[in-house]
């Protein structure tokens, strides 16, 4: 199948790292210099809505790069190189190459080679953590993440303020909270960051509206739940789309799911 230019870039960069492919008996079945003679047939299937703010590009491109790396037996020339390649397909795909808590480092080099993802804590660090995903709409959004970010970069003063003064301190706070399993702080930071992201969208000219009325109801329900418990137990976050991810601990998952099902029953329920 035909893939876009960003996918072609990932494929080209992985080919550069290709090594001999060896079978289980140690026999070389493809020499690294022979890979140039091979074409790649790619089939990508996503069980989640695509282009709806649920990180379909991150998941797809991370899977794409990871699979290619295994196929070509690619060997990194420096730690994190595969995440740098995934970043060229989709920025957030770099973070999706690992589980757990992952930081995408901005980097300082002109060629972007040090803009890589780094795993801060693996997926086993906080086993009680859960994510309740609320699919508000499976329709593709009107404004893509890429075009939206570019418009915000050009027109939103709030984005510059966020980049200059908010991001780095907040990242450090969130990492500390996650490593300490401090859900109260983690949840507050998560929700505040989501709020600011969508404030930037509205500060953009013309404004971008990713959330809808159902999204706002999810926020209100999380606030009601948190008020009831007198602490943060349901931490919402919205990416570039109307669909919600609610972080919570295992003990509170049944209540959160019951509340959401009560207000948003499944068709036919």
Which residue ranges define each predicted feature?
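Short, hydrophobic/aliphatic alpha-helical segments
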Residues: 36-47, 86, 217-229
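ATP-binding N-lobe of GHMP and related small-molecule kinases
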Residues: 1-52, 66-79
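C-terminal nucleotide
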Residues: 121-269
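Short coil/turn connectors at secondary-structure junctions
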Residues: 36-40, 77-80, 98-99, 128-130, ...
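Active-site nucleophile and cofactor-binding loops and adjacent substrate-binding regions
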Residues: 54-56
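Short, well-structured alpha-helical segments that form the helix of a local strand-helix-strand
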Residues: 79-90, 184-193
């Amino acid at each position: 199948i035909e893939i876009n230019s960003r996918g072609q870039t990932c494929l080209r960069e992985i080919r550069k790292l290709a090594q001999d492919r060896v079978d289980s008996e140690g026999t070389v079945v493809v020499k690294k210099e022979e890979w140039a003679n091979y074409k790649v047939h790619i089939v990508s299937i996503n069980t989640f809505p695509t282009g709806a703010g649920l990180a379909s590009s991150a998941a797809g491109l991370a899977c794409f790069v990871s699979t290619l790396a295994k196929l070509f037996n690619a060997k990194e020339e420096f730690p994190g190189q595969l995440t740098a390649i995934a970043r060229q397909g989709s920025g957030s795909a770099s973070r999706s190459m690992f589980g757990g808590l992952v930081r995408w480092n901005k980097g300082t080099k002109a060629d972007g080679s040090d803009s890589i993802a780094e795993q801060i804590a693996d997926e086993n660090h906080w086993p009680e953590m859960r994510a309740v995903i609320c699919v508000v709409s499976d329709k593709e959004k009107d404004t893509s993440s890429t075009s939206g970010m570019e418009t915000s970069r050009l027109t939103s003063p709030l984005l510059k303020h966020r980049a200059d003064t908010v991001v780095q301190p907040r990242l450090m706070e969130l990492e500390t909270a996650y490593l300490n399993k401090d859900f109260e702080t983690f949840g507050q930071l998560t929700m505040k960051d989501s709020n600011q992201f969508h404030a930037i969208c509205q500060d953009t000219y013309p404004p971008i509206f990713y959330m809808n009325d159902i999204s706002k109801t999810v926020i209100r329900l999380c606030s009601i739940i948190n008020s009831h418990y007198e602490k943060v137990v349901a931490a919402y976050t919205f990416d570039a789309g109307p669909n919600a991810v609610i972080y919570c601990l295992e003990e509170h998952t049944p209540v959160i799911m019951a509340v959401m099902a009560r207000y948003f029953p499944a068709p036919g329920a």
